Amino acid sequence: GLKLKEIMEDGTLTAETQPDSFDADGNVKIGYVGAFSYAEVVSGYTAFYLGVKSVVPNVVMEVKYTNSWFDIDKEGAAAEALIANGSVIIGQHADSTGAPAATQKLHDDGKICYSVGYNIDMIATAPTAALTSATNNWAVYYKHAIATVMGGGDLEQDWSAGYNDDAVGITELGESCAEGTADYVADIESKLKDGSLQVFDTSTFTVGGEEVTSAPVDLSFMDYTTDPATVVYQGETVEAIQDGHFAESTFRSAPYFTLRIDGITEDAEAVE
């Protein structure tokens, strides 16, 4: 979001310099490469979009799926298609370097585009296009698991941790990040940790033009390898809206945010 704001304010990105990056209503376009249309990906791309929107309110996002967790060619093709449609920032929830590499190539060719990666630092792949990556710190779980076993305890089958435990975060900031990004990020992380900022604050998004006041979630575990899907474990139904926000990964570790919020469009056909 900060990079988008910077290049819009300094005149680098305008309707004249890159007209296809703005829709008919003047909203600036960003894109996202997703593996599958599962809650895990939907939750991630919605959080990404809301983060950008908190800095640049007039933003819309297009999502393209690859139907694969790791496919360099498809992820690269998805990024190329999104950028061809005008997307300026490309996020991802897919595991390869395909999207950042494609973004860097187009960036080198003069296109105004940048990458936010997933899992690992993408600066080596996209030295001037990579801004940062979302990442997991698995050391937190390894320490927990080892200590539990050494203490004679049983490992939980349903476990999650977040910013409070330093289990998630972002990688090194790239050289193209906007001035002041490090301080801004530190402030946001502090607010996430103390609870004063909620990722899915319902006052920050709408569904069908309406604020979301209720979101029942069925916590059953399903086997999606069968057709139709079958219930493996019958769970209870809970209300996910708690104190004005969607309480993601509170009632179980596996994500369950499946709302399609306004401002985001998903392409019906996966990248071939």
Question: Where are the model-predicted features located?
Answer:
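A residue-level marker of the well-folded mature domains of exported/periplasmic proteins
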Residues: 1-272
